[in-house]
């Protein structure tokens, strides 16, 4: 049984899904490198005892951190005693994770796949009427752009615009939309921007965590008679590199909690109800919050004209 694959593992976290196994550990010293290799050896022993095999040619190692000397000097070995190759990015369950933590490769892959799907739709259907093209967009393209978006997020204005331009270019092909500004297109089609949709989904996901409908990854909820239920947002270390702070700030563990706290109290306090009921109340509120930057159009710096619900 795969459920006991982590038996004897002391310093790492082991996860298995289908025929893939992942081993995660925080390593900051040479002793940590040795401990992680020992945990790998225990997993290899478990595989031998249970007549399981690992394909050493598919072993990949992704390393995060600023300690380049430790990263460059440490080596890990597979069950065949071959060195496990370090990769700048690794694809896991459809999400590409990069060593710099930016998810730029993931967004590049997502936008490429979404654009190919858009071109296929526009080549396959002669009509440019609103209803069929919007239906195709919602059914075939949106799932590509929003897959597992609670994990990855654009952490720079350029990446945000790269995603939005997929929707912008597609909506331009709809009859009567080519001469309209992007935000006017969204209003005419009664659609959200992709940034607003990601934020909406993250708020719903945080609510599911608080309602114990999905696993909790460390969110701490606080309730008071004056402020209602809200999430305690962890502080960012001022000693960390600016790029690290940006990535951390954009993550669900920080920005997701800020988004949830920005929702009105009566929505945050909703409990013991269905997900659809919460979605209905949230959508009713979001219709009152403008989904348009203070500077019209696709802007260069989102800080000057953000359409985030937190900044409204």
Regions found by a protein language model. Name each.
Residues 1-24:
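Active-site palm subdomain of RNA-directed nucleic acid polymerases
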Residues 10, 15, 81-151:
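Basic, alpha-helical interaction scaffolds
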Residues 10, 21-48, 154:
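Catalytic palm subdomain of template-directed nucleic-acid polymerases
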Residues 17-20, 47, 90-100, 114, ...:
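Short, conserved catalytic/metal-binding micro-motifs enriched in Asp/Glu and His
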Residues 38, 53-89:
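Short, conserved micro-motifs composed of acidic
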Residues 44-55, 60-62, 91, 159-223:
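Short, charged alpha-helical motifs in flexible N/C-terminal segments and linkers
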Residues 57, 146-160, 254-312:
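Charged boundary/loop elements
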Residues 81, 134, 215-255:
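Amphipathic alpha-helical
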């Amino acid at each position: 049984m795969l459920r006991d694959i982590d038996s004897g593992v002391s310093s790492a976290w082991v996860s298995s899904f289908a025929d893939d196994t992942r081993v995660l550990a925080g390593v900051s010293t040479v002793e940590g490198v040795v401990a992680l290799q020992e945990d790998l050896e225990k997993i290899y022993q478990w595989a031998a005892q249970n007549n399981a095999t690992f394909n050493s040619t598919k072993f990949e190692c992704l390393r995060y951190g600023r300690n380049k000397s430790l990263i460059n000097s440490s080596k890990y070995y597979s069950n065949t005693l071959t060195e496990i190759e370090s990769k700048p990015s690794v694809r896991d369950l459809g999400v590409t994770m990069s060593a710099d933590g930016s998810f730029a490769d993931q967004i590049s892959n997502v936008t490429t796949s979404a654009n190919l799907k858009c071109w296929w739709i526009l080549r396959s259907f002669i009509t440019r009427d609103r209803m069929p093209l919007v239906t195709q967009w919602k059914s075939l393209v949106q799932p590509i752009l929003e897959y597992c978006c609670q994990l990855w997020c654009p952490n720079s204005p350029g990446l945000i615009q790269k995603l939005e331009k997929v929707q912008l270019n597609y909506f331009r092909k709809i009859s009567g939309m080519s001469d309209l500004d992007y935000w006017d297109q969204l209003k005419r089609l009664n659609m959200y921007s992709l940034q607003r949709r990601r934020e909406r989904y993250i708020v719903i996901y945080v609510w599911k965590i608080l309602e114990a409908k999905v696993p909790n990854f460390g969110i701490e909820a606080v309730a008071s008679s004056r402020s209602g239920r809200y999430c305690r947002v962890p502080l960012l270390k001022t000693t960390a590199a600016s790029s690290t702070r940006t990535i951390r700030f954009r993550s669900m563990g920080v920005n997701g909690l800020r988004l949830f706290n920005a929702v009105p109290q009566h929505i945050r306090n909703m409990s013991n109800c269905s997900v659809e009921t919460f979605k209905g109340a949230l959508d009713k509120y979001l219709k009152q919050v403008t989904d348009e930057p203070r500077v019209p159009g696709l802007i260069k710096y989102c800080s000057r004209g953000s359409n985030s619900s937190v900044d409204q």
